[in-house]
């Protein structure tokens, strides 16, 4: 039974998921259906956390929209996600950046990671 579940879960995984983590700025291209029309909506923000594993893995992205914080949680391997672009690598020391919720302006900025 366990091998069967693992095989089904393996089919659900996407191959082209980029390497990203908390602190990175990403653009998530989401497929949205409005009535009979289908379009791509881009959600750009900072990754707060990445949790779970396999087909159930999710990540949370936070952005500021008209001075209001907007957070959205996406399944990594969702068929509704067209693609994920990493725009900026961030340098952080935590796996979960929940402390950013209480910060505004310059205090909410994350340093950019330097390439080695």
Swiss-Prot record:
InterPro entries: Ribosomal_bL19, Ribosomal_bL19_sf, Translation_prot_SH3-like_sf. The keyword Cytoplasm does not apply. Transmembrane segments: none annotated. One of its GO terms (cellular component) is cytosolic large ribosomal subunit. It holds the Pfam family Ribosomal_L19. One of its GO terms (molecular function) is structural constituent of ribosome. One of its GO terms (biological process) is translation. The keyword Ribosomal protein applies. Gene3D superfamilies: 2.30.30.790. Keywords: Ribonucleoprotein, Ribosomal protein. SUPFAM superfamilies: Translation proteins SH3-like domain (SSF50104). Belongs to the bacterial ribosomal protein bL19 family. This protein is located at the 30S-50S ribosomal subunit interface and may play a role in the structure and function of the aminoacyl-tRNA binding site. HAMAP family: Ribosomal_bL19 (MF_00402). PANTHER family: LARGE RIBOSOMAL SUBUNIT PROTEIN BL19M, RIBOSOMAL PROTEIN L19. This is Large ribosomal subunit protein bL19. The gene is rplS.
